[in-house]
């Protein structure tokens, strides 16, 4: 992949940095793995806004990605690497020996024509999926399950990965990209390697319109609103919040932890780095 810096021929082009997609498949996505994706614009069934700053954006289909990788001992050939508008990572279309096709998250250095396989007897090779108990300590992994058979939930975005640190009893210790070390059951599956499109973090959108293409609407500061619209609103001219930072409903937004899942707290060996 290559980084493309756009010439500053206009204010919208100035500072724009794109990621080359020359190595990706140029045709249409595989129709058998597409599903319609309807615009909700952040509204619920009553039409009320439940998530702000959503709406508009380019229409696209959802690509059904296989996060379980549960076709064991059946080799699959990589037919093509594709762009996916629903995620930062690229996806790979693989064809199994029995003729079934599935999309998977494309690992780095996975090439068209390569063969991948899942299962406990799979070799340690990029793109292969195994239970954590069969993966050597120190390996770089991605698409990690939190519950056996539930499908990958960790390290799925572009350029991400985790490191298998140790195994103790029925749990393994995995260090995330954030620095957090977490216990994961050894029967959970993970894929060897790291996710492709690692240069995604170098992308610069260049103009506000690109965010609108992505379906993201503007965010207005509370201090720029009227008092009826936000607790920070009002005042003559430019004024500060006048209080601790809160959201539009008066809830504190800075300086305290919001995680409340105490049930899985024991699975965290060390917290992430700030």
UniProtKB/Swiss-Prot annotation:
One of its GO terms (molecular function) is transferase activity. One of its GO terms (biological process) is cytoplasmic translation. SUPFAM superfamilies: Nucleic acid-binding proteins, Translation proteins SH3-like domain. One of its GO terms (cellular component) is large ribosomal subunit. Keywords: Ribonucleoprotein, Ribosomal protein, RNA-binding, rRNA-binding. Residues 224-256 are annotated as: Disordered. The keyword Cytoplasm does not apply. PROSITE patterns: RIBOSOMAL_L2 (PS00467). Gene3D superfamilies: 2.30.30.30, Nucleic acid-binding proteins, Ribosomal protein L2, domain 3. Residues 229-246 have a biased composition (Basic and acidic residues). Transmembrane segments: none annotated. Pfam families: Ribosomal_L2, Ribosomal_L2_C. HAMAP family: Ribosomal_uL2_B. Part of the 50S ribosomal subunit. Forms a bridge to the 30S subunit in the 70S ribosome. Belongs to the universal ribosomal protein uL2 family. One of the primary rRNA binding proteins. Required for association of the 30S and 50S subunits to form the 70S ribosome, for tRNA binding and peptide bond formation. It has been suggested to have peptidyltransferase activity; this is somewhat controversial. Makes several contacts with the 16S rRNA in the 70S ribosome. This is Large ribosomal subunit protein uL2. It comes from Acidovorax ebreus (strain TPSY).
């Amino acid at each position: 992949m290559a980084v493309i810096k756009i010439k500053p021929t206009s204010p919208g082009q100035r500072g724009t940095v794109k990621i080359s997609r020359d190595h990706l498949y140029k045709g249409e996505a595989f129709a058998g793995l597409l599903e319609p994706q309807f615009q909700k614009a952040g509204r619920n069934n009553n039409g009320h806004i439940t998530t702000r700053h959503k709406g508009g954006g380019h229409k696209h289909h959802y690509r059904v990605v296989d996060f379980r990788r549960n076709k064991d001992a059946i080799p699959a050939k990589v037919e093509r690497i594709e762009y996916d508008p629903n995620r930062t990572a690229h996806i790979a279309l693989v064809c199994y020996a029995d003729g079934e096709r599935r999309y998977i998250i494309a690992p780095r250095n996975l090439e068209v024509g390569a063969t991948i396989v899942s299962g406990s007897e799979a070799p340690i090779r990029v793109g292969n999926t195994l239970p954590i108990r069969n993966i050597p300590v120190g390996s770089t992994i991605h698409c990690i399950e939190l519950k056996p058979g539930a499908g990958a939930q960790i390290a799925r975005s572009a350029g991400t990965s985790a490191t298998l640190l140790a195994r103790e009893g029925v749990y393994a210790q995995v260090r995330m990209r954030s620095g957090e070390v977490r216990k994961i059951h050894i029967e959970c599956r993970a894929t060897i390697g790291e996710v492709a499109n690692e240069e995604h973090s170098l992308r610069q959108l260049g103009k506000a319109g690109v965010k609108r293409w992505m379906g993201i609407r503007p965010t207005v500061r509370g201090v720029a609103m009227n008092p009826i619209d936000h607790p920070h609103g009002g005042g003559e001219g430019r004024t500060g919040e006048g209080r601790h930072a809160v959201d539009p409903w008066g809830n504190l937004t800075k300086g305290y932890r919001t995680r409340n899942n105490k049930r899985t707290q024991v699975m965290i060996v060390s917290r992430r780095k700030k």
